[in-house]
Every structure is written in C-alpha cells, then in structure tokens.
C-alpha cells in the first residue's frame, strides 16, 4: 500500500476546549507529511463537513483532534460510516477513555491499580458530605471533571472547607466529577506505539501539579526520559501500561498517564488516545529516545490507520 498516492486529510482544530493545542499538533503533523512527499491537507471540522471527505477525494484521515468531538468516538463513528480509514483508536476505545470515571472502573474490574475516588454528579452534589469524603480519602484531594481533557477544571483541595467550591468549579466543565486521593509520588506518562510500549517520561511541573499552563505554555516544566526508574520498575510499568491499553481496547497509538503514591506504587490515571504532537509534546520526546524521529513517528502512526 503506497500511502503517498493517497489524498490524506489531517483533521485538526475542531470545537473542543483543546482546539488551540490540536491546531498546533495538526500543523506539526501536516508539515512532517508534506516534507516527506505525502499529499496531505489540513481539515478543520469547525469549518468543513467531514462527512464530505470521501466525496472530495480523500482516502484516509490522520486524526489529531483533541477532546470532545474528535477524540470521544463521535468523529471515529462518522469516519467509519463514510468508510474512511483513520489513525488511532476506534469508536469504543475513544468513547470509553474520554470518560475517566468509567475507564477507571473498567481497569479496577481487571484488577489494575487506580486511585481511590468518590464520584459526584450535578444531581448528587447537594448530598456531598465533605467530612465523610475526607475521612475516606484523606487530604489533600484532587478534584477533576470526568470528561474534559488537558487538565481543564482541576483543583488541589488542601482543606475540607475547600471541597465544595472545587467541585462547583469542576461542574462548570462537566456533569460528573471525580474526587480522588492525592497521589504524592512521581508523575509518569507512557506512550504505546503499535503495541510496543515506549520509554516512560517523568514529569516535574513547576507548580503543584501538571495543569493546562504546565502542559502547553510553561517552559519550566521538566521532563525526564529515561524517567530514572530502575530497570525492574520500568519493566513493571511497561507491563502495567500494556495491560491497561489492551483492557480499554486501544489501537495504533495512545499515551497512558500514571501516578505514583507516596510509597511508589503505580496508579493508572487516564488514556490519551490522540496524544499531543507539538514541540512541547511527550510522545515525540519518548519516541526520539529509541531513535524514532518526529517525521518517522508521523508516518508510522499513519501506516497503522485502519
């Protein structure tokens, strides 16, 4: 299959809260494809009806949309309907992993380690008992929307009095909120490419946690790859991540975030099914340590499209 003879749509932008990040990722992917002689075109679903891709002569889509409408199964379903092969996870894995709560419940059912949590919805918010939550999960706590990506709507709660307002803030972004035990250990992210687990990256944010600012704007967030784990721990992490990837049905490529508790035990956090591909992005950083250039990575992801 010679993909250079195909007309490729690079899906970027979109309408989610992560539009800007997707535009940056898409630009980098598009440049890498054009540089290598691919017939690639930028397509922004905000301005173009993706249902017309096949009719307009496109053969394949490189989906680098982030967040709702691009990474949550809806775009995947549309592409399936028009019969256009696309990069990344399918409908089910994309929809499932967009929902952090249900992803964690599934992992838990598979016997995989996740943080202890309490789920609050818009409907149950009035019954929230901060004292009981703190008694069960301790302090500090992490409060986050279940569905929003890129660390939008997160709050670190250090006192019981702060819990309600943190949940109220998160409810601006989603109807389902997770209150989780605070994981005080290392923050790691682990890319998977074509069923191969790539080296983990350790993230050391300037602030208290890895939020939108640290992710996309700050140059003071530090990334370590290799992550400084012992070979045994790196292997254990790799095995855990592969099991987590398979449990939710990922394919092609994804990046899985993992936190350590104060004792160093791994806890699965979430799956990014369309990881960022900007200059700040972590997937390319990890791939580079095993000799895969950005251009090679983009082509590899494209070749894995189904």
UniProtKB/Swiss-Prot annotation:
Biological process (GO), any one: regulation of cell shape
Catalytic activity line of the entry: 2 D-alanine + ATP = D-alanyl-D-alanine + ADP + phosphate + H(+)
Entry EC number(s): 6.3.2.4
Ranges of residues in domain ATP-grasp: 104-303
Pfam families: Dala_Dala_lig_C (PF07478), Dala_Dala_lig_N (PF01820)
PROSITE patterns tied to this protein: ATP_GRASP (PS50975), DALA_DALA_LIGASE_1 (PS00843), DALA_DALA_LIGASE_2 (PS00844)
GO MF, one example: D-alanine-D-alanine ligase activity
Record keywords, A-Z: ATP-binding, Cell shape, Cell wall biogenesis/degradation, Cytoplasm, Ligase, Magnesium, Manganese, Metal-binding, Nucleotide-binding, Peptidoglycan synthesis
UniProt binding sites for Mg(2+) 1: 257, 270
Active-site residues, record numbering mapped to chain: 18, 150, 281
SUPFAM superfamilies linked to this entry: Glutathione synthetase ATP-binding domain-like, PreATP-grasp domain
Residues that bind ATP: 134-189
A GO CC annotation given for this chain: cytosol
Role played: Cell wall formation.
Family to which this protein belongs: Belongs to the D-alanine--D-alanine ligase family.
HAMAP family, alphabetized: Dala_Dala_lig
Protein name: D-alanine--D-alanine ligase
């Amino acid at each position: 299959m010679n993909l250079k003879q195909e007309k490729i749509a690079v899906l970027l932008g979109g309408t989610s809260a992560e539009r800007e990040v997707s535009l940056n990722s898409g630009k980098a992917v598009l440049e890498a494809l054009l540089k290598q002689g691919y017939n690639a075109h930028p397509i922004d679903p905000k301005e173009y009806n993706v249902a017309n891709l096949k009719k307009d002569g496109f053969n394949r889509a490189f989906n680098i949309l982030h967040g709702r409408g691009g990474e949550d199964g809806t775009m995947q379903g549309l592409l399936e309907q028009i019969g256009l092969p696309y990069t990344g996870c399918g409908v089910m894995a994309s929809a499932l992993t967009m929902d952090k709560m249900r992803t964690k419940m599934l992992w838990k059912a598979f016997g995989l380690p996740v943080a202890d949590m309490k789920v609050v919805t818009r409907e149950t918010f009035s019954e929230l008992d901060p004292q009981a939550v703190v008694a069960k999960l301790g302090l500090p706590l992490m409060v986050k929307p279940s569905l929003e990506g890129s660390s939008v709507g997160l709050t670190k709660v250090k006192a019981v009095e702060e819990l309600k307002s943190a949940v109220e803030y998160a409810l601006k972004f989603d109807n389902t909120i997770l209150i989780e035990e605070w994981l005080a250990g290392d923050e790691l992210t682990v890319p998977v490419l074509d069923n191969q687990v790539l080296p983990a990256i350790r993230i050391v944010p300037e602030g208290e946690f890895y939020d939108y600012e640290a992710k996309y704007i700050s140059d003071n967030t530090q990334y370590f790859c290799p992550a400084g784990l012992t070979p045994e721990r790196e292997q254990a992490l790799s095995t855990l991540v592969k099991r987590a990837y398979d449990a939710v049905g990922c394919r092609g490529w994804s990046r899985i975030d993992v936190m350590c508790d104060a004792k160093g035990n791994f806890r699965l956090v979430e799956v990014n099914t369309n990881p960022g591909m900007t200059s700040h992005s972590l997937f390319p950083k990890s791939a580079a340590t095993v000799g895969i250039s950005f251009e090679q990575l983009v082509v590899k992801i494209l070749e894995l499209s189904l």
